[in-house]
């Protein structure tokens, strides 16, 4: 009997020891019911109100508070209890045949690694670009062709593709994201004590905000702008710029519309959704870095990252701000790396996935104009493979989770596989990566499976030291009856 009791006490003691979150795991946030402390050598930091994460550095931190929500929690929060370390898929494996065109697990680069700095895709000039017809045009149940203009003309050159990018950007802003403002009249900045202070003035109004800068080395270090805080490991030699995107545009709930410093400057009725406002904030950070050498950052080697809701924002920032050298959206799902049409298709298959009709009820990430189109996205002349395509040929590394049904595991894979054709057309496949793996919590970076990929992208496009494969199209999920070829009925031109 004593032996049994002793064994039970040992089990309980072991359980208590384990009641801490591990590296890159969740450790707090609204609705969180798991451990609030981190294992030794990690600190619980706040990414946003909904998600706190254990990151390397420091000793165990005190338990962060988890305030009760003042509004109903969203329908896509991080897990409310810690999942197993290697969770099975949340739906039974598909019984249909495997895809007719399975993705390569990690295809080799189709061209040699670049020996010069990566392309930067400057904003296309409007001088010789065709005018865009008004209206939505004809609907399309499949993904719209990124190589055909809205007027039906075909893209036949790299210059044409820049015009097409300009057209797509305009259409996405008009029908989904809201207007991305032109550069403001004035941006001033100063740097002191690892804080970059920024003041923006436009049309008689001014706002100020600041970001913190840590890490890096030398007077012109590359940097990654992290929405909230980084949920990926940032290597030595690369600075981290922590951007409080909620300060620029609030994202507490559907009642947050028009709140934040962006709207103080441009008015609460501005058409921009929160993600567009955040992208504007990123642009102003880069303005400030260009004006403030004392910050020690090379503004031509800046990346952007975020996870979940902030990952959606990172994708939009990369699409709207051409000075970003590397975009790393992590588990962004619907509104980010997923295509609306494929998310709807998944829902029609009985899967629990975030759809466009649902996302507009959850938050204010998109412009209010999207409320008019969320129930009929087949009428839109674009989808998110083209949002991603606004980044081409700049570098994009998309991190997704093959175990999370809500993110749209097929919608993200299919959408980014379609997006990849734009890098292919430009001869820039080495600048595109999509990696969808499982066995980790939401927003918990899977170091065992993705560190080499992440490091290869950072080395090549920020540190500019080369090394590693950066042409990646990888998924660990069987996508069943999904047939990529049926969703991408276009030929890929040679625009090199």
Swiss-Prot record:
UniProt feature, compositional bias: Pro residues: 59-125
Species, as recorded: Sodiomyces alcalophilus
Binding positions for substrate per the UniProt entry: 312, 354, 362, 406
E.C. number(s) listed in UniProt: 3.1.1.117
Top-rank taxon: Eukaryota
UniProt keyword annotation of Disulfide bond present: yes
Active site: residue positions: 308 (nucleophile), 442 (proton donor/acceptor)
Localization (cell): Secreted
Residue ranges of domain CBM1 in the record: 20-55
Cystine bridges: 129-163, 307-443, 339-415
One record GO biological process: lignin catabolic process
Gene3D superfamilies: alpha/beta hydrolase
Enzyme class: hydrolase
Major localization class: secreted
Annotated keywords: Disulfide bond, Hydrolase, Lignin degradation, Secreted, Serine esterase, Signal
Record-given protein name: 4-O-methyl-glucuronoyl methylesterase 1
Region annotation (Disordered) ranges: 57-151
UniProt cross-references to InterPro entries, sorted A to Z: AB_hydrolase_fold, CBD_sf, Cellulose-bd_dom_fun, GCE-like_dom
Motif placement: GXSYXG catalytic site motif: 306-311
Family membership noted in the UniProt record: Belongs to the carbohydrate esterase 15 (CE15) family.
